From Swiss-Prot:
InterPro entries: Huwentoxin-1. It comes from Chilobrachys guangxiensis (Chinese earth tiger tarantula). Disulfide bonds join C46-C61, C53-C66, C60-C73. Keywords: Amidation, Disulfide bond, Ion channel impairing toxin, Knottin, Secreted, Signal, Toxin. The lineage of its organism: Eukaryota, Metazoa, Ecdysozoa, Arthropoda, Chelicerata. It holds the Pfam family Toxin_12. The modification Tryptophan amide is found at W78. Probable ion channel inhibitor. Expressed by the venom gland. Residues 1-19 form the signal peptide. GO terms for molecular function: ion channel inhibitor activity; toxin activity. The presence of a 'disulfide through disulfide knot' structurally defines this protein as a knottin. This is U24-theraphotoxin-Cg1a.
């Protein structure tokens, strides 16, 4: 009788842990999907940081600049 009680208690603990793990896993999946949804590339008319550019027609986004010596968009320190 005692053995059956111990097996029943262990089964209940196992089911409780499994349910808790599934709830935690679904929460993690929601957080990860939200993070990756934010990082999807957006279409824009300007080039972002470290994008290859042409200094003749500087299409870098505001705050970045393209120079002849380094043909990629970088932060414009001097404004």
């Amino acid at each position: 009788m005692r053995v059956l009680f111990i097996i029943a208690v262990l089964a209940l603990i196992s089911v409780g842990c499994y349910a808790s793990e599934m709830k935690d896993r679904s929460s993690r999946n929601e957080v990860l999907s939200a993070i990756f949804a934010i990082e999807e590339p957006q279409e824009r008319d300007c080039l972002g940081l470290f994008w290859i550019c042409n200094y003749m027609d500087d299409k870098c986004c505001p705050g970045y600049k393209c120079e002849r010596s380094s043909p990629w968009c970088k932060i414009d320190i001097w404004g």
